[in-house]
Amino acid sequence: MNQYIKKETRLADFDPCPRFIWNEGLSSLAISVYTLLLGRVSLSKQNDMIDEQGRVYVIYTVKHMAEKLSRSEPPIYAALKMLEEKGLIERKSSGKGNPNHIYVKIKP
């Protein structure tokens, strides 16, 4: 049964969703993908997934994103493309057979 949130209620783990994202003209799936990727940044920091320029990157395969969001892979690819076009992520190849490094960007 669901409970009301009270002052002493501890919230379970959640992925952050910054307020600026709602004004970017993105699909709801693209917002979900961005939120998922932004949530993964904390884990990347803990695991020292930092490039030579000091930028944190995320490794998250399209297959796993699709599973997490209960979607097929083509809509995830479209959402990633939309996020790239808006300048909110950047994908860099990490070599043949390896997953891309995804740099998640935020607005200052």
For each predicted feature, which ranges?
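Short recognition helix of helix-turn-helix/winged-helix DNA-binding domains
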Residues: M1-K63
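Winged helix-turn-helix DNA-binding recognition segment
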Residues: L43-V104
